[in-house]
């Protein structure tokens, strides 16, 4: 049997603090379990990551303000601008990685809710192999996965590459 756990079938943004099945979403693209009883949902057109508490069915905003900008690094993820949240993954330490397609970047939200740029930035490019991830550039990343060894793998789509 199939049933809806989040979203009411209409386009928009609403419902924080209420039942997830009554919430609106614009374009959910990916989801990941957070290891704390939640399902994180990347909504690329809403510029947010939402969190569904699986036990209570309540939805809240985990990251993003709805503004289509790349802002807020070093601050709370809930107060940061997210630029095209295409995909997410959660590592074994509880850190959440956000793949920002339009922002050409990977950002991390640590267990205390602080967001940090990990790789890329607003400018498109293909550089940085062999160096620190923070100095690398990306071009339209579309997917991200965290492996059991703590690596973050990125589908760097427009560069026709998988990067780690």
Predicted ranges, named:
Residues 1, 47-51, 58, 104-108, ...:
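A short loop-to-beta-strand structural motif that recurs across blades of beta-propeller domains
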Residues 1-27, 56-84, 113-140:
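Gly/Pro-rich loop segments of beta-rich domains
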Residues 27-30, 41:
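Beta-strand-rich domains and repeat architectures in extracellular enzymes and scaffolds
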Residues 31, 51, 152:
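Phosphodiester-processing cores and adjacent nucleic acid-binding clamps
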Residues 33-36, 90-93, 146-149:
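Residue-level detector of Asp-centered blade-edge/turn motifs that repeat once per structural unit
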Residues 38-41, 95-98, 151-154:
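Conserved beta-propeller blade signature
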Residues 44, 101, 157-158:
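Short loop/turn segments immediately following the C-termini of beta-strands
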């Amino acid at each position: 049997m199939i049933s809806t756990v989040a979203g009411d079938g209409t386009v928009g943004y609403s419902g924080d603090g209420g039942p997830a099945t009554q919430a609106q979403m614009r374009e959910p693209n990916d989801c990941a379990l957070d290891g704390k009883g939640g399902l994180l949902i990347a909504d690329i057109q809403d510029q947010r990551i939402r969190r569904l508490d699986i036990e209570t069915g309540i939805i809240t905003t985990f990251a993003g303000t709805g503004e289509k900008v790349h802002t807020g690094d070093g601050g709370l993820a809930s107060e940061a601008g997210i630029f095209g949240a295409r995909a997410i993954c959660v590592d074994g330490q509880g850190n959440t990685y956000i793949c920002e397609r339009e922002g050409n970047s990977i950002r991390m939200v640590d267990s205390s809710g602080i967001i940090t740029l990990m790789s890329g930035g607003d400018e498109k490019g293909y550089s940085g192999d062999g160096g620190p991830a923070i100095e690398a550039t990306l071009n339209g990343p579309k997917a991200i996965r965290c492996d059991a060894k703590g690596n973050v793998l990125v589908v760097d789509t427009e560069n026709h590459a998988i990067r780690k």
